[in-house]
Amino acid sequence: MSIEKFKEMLERQRRVDQVVRSQKMSRHEVAEVLVHKQHEAELANAIKGQTAAELGETLDGLSLEQACELWQRIPEALINDILWEMSDERRLELAGGREPDIEGSKISIFELVDGKLRQMPYTGKRDLEGVRPVWVDLIHASKAQRAYIGAHFGVELPDPLDVTDLEVSARFHIEDNDAIHLHSNFLLDRAGDSRSVPVAFVLHRGILFSLREEDLPVFRLQRRLARTQPGYVTDAVDVLLDLYGADVECSSDSLENSYAILAKVGKLVLNESVSDEQAASILSDIAEEEDQNGRIRSNILDTQRALNFLMRGRLLTAPQMEDAKQILRNIDSLNSHTAFLFDKINFLMDATIGFININQNKRVNQLTIFSVVFMPINVL
């Protein structure tokens, strides 16, 4: 809805209020209730149909009096997102000293000081003024927050869940403003809840922006290392490469865990006999490890494509090129392990199903013997 439409609705509401007040008392009361409800419902529906960005733009375009009238009718649930969209001048006029907060999200800003990452306090818009970070990490950031931070640094920040296409050109590309976009999956390895988490990266003017919907151990580890070890990173690309390298290491640890679990399963399968209950448990473990192995293989191949994109684009310095090649060698090593684990999983699956078939054949033989023993003599 256009700003002019909101102006028209608010002006009509003001004129109706003036007319209502000029009526006699009895008619005034009836008209006031009916007209007030009608126009309030119309305004509420108009507000409901707008995004936070559209409402912020509308509030900036209205006169102060009209903006105050509209502001009073905006639901509290939308206030914080709209505060991110409004100009600072209009925000001060309507909300006083209230700053847009980062409720439900986590925004971390890091600058490079003496070869170490130093996290800067961030609670609202004013903390971005005069800042030249090397890494901005956003977890579960709203569209309004992404838009404001992106506009502040002159880059568009995507939703990490938007790009799920397998096409390389969709996941790894360079925008017209030289912003480098990469969309990758990182492993979240938790007992009973292991999955891939989409992460969007943007490299722009020496700043790495990372966007995701939940925290990852890989990111916590890299923040700790970069804060404590001088020279661990020298620029935003170093941070990106270290995150990819740490994800490969996390995948390696997960594969070691899969080896240990499958070794235990193998001992059970190689026993002289396996009950149906044991077989069911074994099949469950095997299926879980097969799923995890496939997830790891997919993630490291995704990382491999991202690194190849950076290398082909001549976006790395000579030392960074060596780091990327080392990560690729680690990925090649893991690929052979995932292939071996798939073979081992298939063997254990076939062996377990074989035991189930043996158990079924035993029961069939028993039923056959019982049926012959108790068969009537005249049938024999």
Q: Residue spans of the language-model regions?
A:
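Solvent-exposed alpha-helical segments within well-ordered globular domains of core cellular machineries
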Residues: G56-D60, Q72, N80-W84, G96, ...
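A short, charged helix-loop
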Residues: L216-V239, A263, K267-A280
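Extracellular-loop-to-transmembrane junctions of the mid-late helices
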Residues: T234-D253
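Conserved residues at beta->alpha junctions
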Residues: L34, I139-H140, E213, G245, ...
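Hydrophobic packing positions in regular secondary-structure scaffolds
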Residues: M1-R98, E103
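Divalent-cation
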Residues: E93, G97-P230, T234
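Membrane-associated alpha-helical segments
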Residues: G206, D247, D253, N257-A260, ...
